[in-house]
Amino acid sequence: EGVAVNDELTLVIDIGKSHAKLLMVDAQGTVVERHGRANASVPSALGYPALDVQGLEDWMAQTLRASSHTARCRRVITSTHGAALVALGDEGLAWAPVDYEFDGLAQHPLLASAFDAAADGFAYTLSPDLPAGLNAARQLFYVQNLHPEAWRRTRCLLPYAQYWAWR
């Protein structure tokens, strides 16, 4: 027994820096159900601020289990910050996702200089030299150099939006 096409909903997962939302939207664009929660970084086991993946996942699972509309959702659309990414290992997260506003390299001037020397310029990347972790390469360089064991566990990198669609 399926859901009639005109009864189908799209689940929108919108994860912002300070707030996360789950919306269930019908074919006409009407929001049928809306849920939200505060969102903030959490301390990681490696000592840097991390995106709250577990808190968000627990909230989403609880919210979707409690909704009478979940069975009607046939599509998922995710929206997150473009600099957020997740590293997967053989058994889930390889390391907690670095908060993209964390400037880990600023705490290590020699490492920051090494990054600046190694990074390709705008003409090659078409990305300006953004501060903190707003260039994902800064986050990756930070983990590679300060947490090499965590980096070795990395098998795959996913943009944050794709992680939530996959999850």
Regions found by a protein language model. Name each.
Residues 2-96, 153:
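N-terminal glycine/serine-rich phosphate-binding loop of ATP-dependent small-molecule kinases
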Residues 65-167:
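Glycine-rich phosphate-binding/catalytic subdomain of phosphoryl-transfer
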